[in-house]
């Protein structure tokens, strides 16, 4: 291994003439990254009540019946998934995927995750399982309003971004 020097740049480690890219590439935050493990990006714009919801959701999916998950999503078409991904920031739960809105899919996936956490049956000191971490997601689905919907509603009433920022810290 040797150190390469580029004018105006930090020194770069190189091995066999190849510039080391693993560190710079690890700073890119895509929705998921495949390394020696799969790293999933979780929710990063939520309050304390939802910080554990994302990880608990994924744990529930992995400890649940993966065949049920596969059955639910196996007929999804790649181009429709990409289209829903692109439309979701604007349309939220009204985004369509395979003829159903995202609220429909979110509800079904959340139920599968709950079953997985129930199967895992890891209890806290109060003898409650990890499904309690999904309560925030259940409220979002029950209210049919995303965090973005709530922020837009507050802004349309107040139009003070500082006030909205304080409310969501």
Spans of model-derived segments:
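C-terminal accessory/tail domains of diverse enzymes
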Residues: 1-166
């Amino acid at each position: 291994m040797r150190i390469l020097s580029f004018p105006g740049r930090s020194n770069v480690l190189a091995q066999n003439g190849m510039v080391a890219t693993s560190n710079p590439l690890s700073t890119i935050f895509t929705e998921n990254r495949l390394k020696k493990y799969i790293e999933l990006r979780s929710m990063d714009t939520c309050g304390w009540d939802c910080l554990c919801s994302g990880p608990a959701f994924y744990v529930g999916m992995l400890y649940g019946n993966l065949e049920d998950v596969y059955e639910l999503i196996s007929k999804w078409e790649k181009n429709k998934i990409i289209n829903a991904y692109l439309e979701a920031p604007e349309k939220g739960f009204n985004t369509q995927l395979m003829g159903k809105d995202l609220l429909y899919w979110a509800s079904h996936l959340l139920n599968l995750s709950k079953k997985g956490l129930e199967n895992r049956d890891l209890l806290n000191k109060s003898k409650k399982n990890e499904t309690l971490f999904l309560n925030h997601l259940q409220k979002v689905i029950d209210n049919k309003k995303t965090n973005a919907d709530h922020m837009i509603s507050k802004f349309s009433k107040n139009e003070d971004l500082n006030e909205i920022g304080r409310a969501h810290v």
